[in-house]
């Protein structure tokens, strides 16, 4: 993101090329099983919302600063991953970690919610909705995520957003 912003500000084509190269490497690491060291053991395999969420925002930043033909396709894929695997409408929740198939892991690793992190993801999706001419589906998805996690994350006793909550 920094190299792309610098490239836009300075007109430095080498910095733009470096930003695109690093973005490609990030895509490779994010999508090639086994390339990254897993956060958890194979006892309870899982995946987190962090990678698709941050990669979506990175692609948005590259698209807005220097452009990259891969961005639109990858942003769409990462939004679908978040919606399909992490947004749980039946319990009005956005999960931080899920099993590889998107199911909830009934263990501390899978039950821990991070409301602020999910709200950040909602913000990125709403930003994308604006970019896509106020895409109704993305507005609805982002608002749903925000509503779910605001309700779960607001500290009714002291105010503010709680860092972590149990899903149940």
Predicted regions: what they are:
Residues 1-168:
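Glycan-recognition and catalytic cores of secretory/periplasmic carbohydrate-active enzymes
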């Amino acid at each position: 993101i920094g190299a792309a912003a610098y490239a836009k500000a300075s007109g430095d084509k080498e910095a733009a090329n470096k930003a695109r190269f690093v973005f490609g490497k990030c895509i490779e690491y994010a999508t090639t099983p086994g390339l990254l060291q897993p956060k958890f053991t194979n006892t309870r395999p899982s995946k987190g919302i962090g990678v698709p969420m941050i990669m979506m925002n990175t692609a948005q930043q590259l698209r807005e600063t220097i452009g990259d033909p891969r961005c639109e396709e990858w942003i769409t894929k990462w939004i679908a991953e978040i919606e399909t695997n992490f947004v749980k409408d039946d319990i009005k929740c956005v999960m931080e970690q899920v099993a590889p198939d998107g199911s909830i892991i009934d263990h501390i690793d899978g039950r821990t919610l991070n409301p602020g992190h999910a709200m950040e993801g909602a913000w990125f999706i709403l930003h994308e909705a604006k970019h896509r001419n106020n895409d109704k589906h993305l507005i609805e998805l982002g608002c749903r995520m925000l509503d779910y996690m605001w309700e779960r994350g607001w500290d009714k006793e002291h105010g503010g957003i709680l860092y972590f909550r149990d899903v149940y």
